[in-house]
Structure formats: structure tokens, C-alpha cells
């Protein structure tokens, strides 16, 4: 009788473990399907941001962003004086970055990085504005999923960094993404969601850099998709 009970317990434990493993496999597959590509073919967003760091406190910025297929455009303007801070475009993965009084920078967008830790990986921020969180253009060395009651945690290891994505167990809505590289950690909190063409989209981004204590708070006031995005971007010559 005891042996039979033990057999039942082992069989039950094996069944639970198998179901759990299958559930985890399904969730990680769904996460990769959702987060490795943008749900939009075209998206335009604009809004205001406040930057703190480098002895600057709450410097206002006006930001415009546009993605159309594989092409991306972004501009940042001084929110007080209206002067251009930067504008960039990416065509077929080739970046052209223009900064006042500097020669244009041209580089492969996948490999481009900046010295300032908070802006180390510009492509990450462009992807996030596309609502994309896993970069299949880079080789993924590891992936690990931790299941939670309300929120799941997915860790993606690349050669130069480890991204941690926290998303809703029920809706797959992203709450937070952090980027660990060298001795630094960039933490990005997404909030105040709206819907574009019935697709959830965040209107608030809070970006913090652990090492250099820099912070960028970005609030999107206008976001459009599809033909509406194309029409709005055309007004900027994009």
C-alpha cells in the first residue's frame, strides 16, 4: 500500500512538473513572438521630456519619433529656446546622426553605441518606441523565464548586455525593462498606457542610469499609427 502511494505521488509530481515545463515553454514562445517585432508597420510619436544629469536639472526637451518599416527618424529640440539638439535617421540599418556644430556621424545602427551610459544603446530606445523589446538582429546567448502570479520576468543575454523584461502574466503588457552592461544598469519603467488601433502603447517612459545618476522622463502627448502616422511625419519632411 505504501509503495503504491509513493508511486502515485511520484507520478503526480512528474505530471505537475511536465505541465509546468510545457506552460513555461508556451509563455516564453509567446513572449518572443510578441516582443521580437513591432505590432506597427508605421508609428509616429511626439511629446515632452525632462533630462537631469551633467549638472543639469529638469532640462526640457521636445521629441519627435517616426518609424516606417525599417526606416526610423528622431529629432530632439531644446524645450526652452527651440534650438536643435540632434536629429537622426536610419535607412536600411545605416544611421546618420546630426548634432549642431559637429560632423555628421554615420554608422551601422545595430552596432552604434554612445559613451554616456544612459544613452549607451540608441537602438534599444528606438525599438522600445516601436514597442519591440527583443533584438533578433543580435545573437542571443541565453534566455531565462521566471514565472510569477501577476508578472513574469524574462532575461535575455546578448554578448554586450543582459536585458530583463517584466511583463503582465495575463496581458503581456510591459511594465519594466532593465539593461545591464559592464558595471552599469539602465532601468526603464513604462506606464500610463493608451491603445493605438486596439494595441496597448505606453505614454510614459522613465529612464534612469545607475552609474552616472542621469534620468530622462518622457511623456508622449501624441501617438499615431499607419496612414495617420505617415501624414503627421510628412509635415516634418520625413
Set out the residue ranges of the language-model regions:
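Bacterial N-terminal signal peptides that target proteins for export
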Residues: 1-9
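Bacterial N-terminal signal peptides
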Residues: 8-17
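N-terminal leader/targeting segments and the immediate start of mature chains
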Residues: 17-70, 235-238
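Flexible, processing/modification-adjacent segments and terminal tails
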Residues: 22-30, 97-163, 234-238
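Hydrophobic lipid-interacting interfaces of membrane-associated proteins
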Residues: 48-54, 79-82, 102, 182, ...
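Extended lipid/amphipathic-ligand handling interfaces
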Residues: 62-67, 88, 92, 189-195
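Mid-chain, structured segments of secreted extracytoplasmic proteins
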Residues: 70-106
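Gly/Pro-enriched, hydrophobic low-complexity segments
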Residues: 143-237
Amino acid at each position: 500500500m505504501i509503495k503504491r502511494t509513493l508511486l502515485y505521488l511520484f507520478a503526480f509530481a512528474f505530471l505537475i512538473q511536465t505541465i509546468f515545463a510545457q506552460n513555461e515553454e508556451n509563455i516564453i514562445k509567446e513572449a518572443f513572438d510578441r516582443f521580437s517585432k513591432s505590432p506597427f508597420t508605421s508609428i509616429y510619436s511626439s511629446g515632452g521630456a525632462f533630462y537631469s544629469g551633467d549638472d543639469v536639472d529638469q532640462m526640457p526637451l521636445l521629441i519627435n519619433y517616426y518609424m516606417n518599416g525599417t526606416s526610423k527618424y528622431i529629432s530632439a529640440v531644446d524645450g526652452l529656446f527651440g534650438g536643435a539638439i540632434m536629429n537622426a535617421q536610419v535607412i536600411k540599418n545605416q544611421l546618420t546622426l546630426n548634432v549642431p556644430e559637429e560632423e555628421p556621424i554615420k554608422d551601422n545602427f545595430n552596432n552604434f553605441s554612445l559613451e554616456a551610459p544612459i544613452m549607451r544603446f540608441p537602438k534599444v530606445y528606438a525599438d522600445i518606441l516601436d514597442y519591440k523589446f527583443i533584438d533578433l538582429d543580435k545573437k542571443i546567448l541565453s534566455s531565462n523565464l521566471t514565472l510569477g502570479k501577476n508578472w513574469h520576468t524574462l532575461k535575455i543575454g546578448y554578448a554586450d548586455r543582459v536585458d530583463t523584461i517584466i511583463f503582465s502574466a495575463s496581458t503581456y503588457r510591459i511594465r519594466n525593462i532593465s539593461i545591464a552592461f559592464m558595471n552599469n544598469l539602465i532601468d526603464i519603467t513604462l506606464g500610463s498606457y493608451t491603445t493605438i488601433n486596439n494595441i496597448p502603447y505606453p505614454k510614459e517612459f522613465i529612464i534612469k542610469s545607475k552609474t552616472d545618476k542621469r534620468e530622462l522622463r518622457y511623456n508622449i502627448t501624441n501617438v499615431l499609427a499607419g496612414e495617420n502616422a505617415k501624414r503627421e511625419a510628412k509635415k516634418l519632411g520625413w
